[in-house]
């Protein structure tokens, strides 16, 4: 999940006493300095995507290596230009998305940040769900799951390997075909 949405200020930021609409990223410094400027319009539902790739899974074990997660990419990031600070460390550390305690933290942060709904990528390959552990074992088992609604988005595409790994040459999509339940 790490999702890179936790703690992000919503784009709907608006000042109560003025008609000015604040826009990100231009007004980020102003908004971050004064949380009173943030106001969620009545009836607006804010959703964020949940990409379940920060936990060990059978899919990763098959394509990459045993225990591989997206954190491997974060750790191996290198600067592309002067001033580009890489690798970066996740603010909360490397949390395992398949654990309810991780989602208790994320759900609390979502609620505090005005995020109402998480839209989960849902993968189905080789006749079974893939990368489902974060939703089924983590999010749905968290004690505060009712604080954040959720929906599943069917990700009806092959898994593309877009970067070099130890176990593939990066040129093939996995699986060659996908199926539906």
Predicted regions and their residues:
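Bacterial Sec-dependent N-terminal signal peptides
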Residues: 1-16
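Glycan-processing catalytic domains of CAZymes
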Residues: 15-181
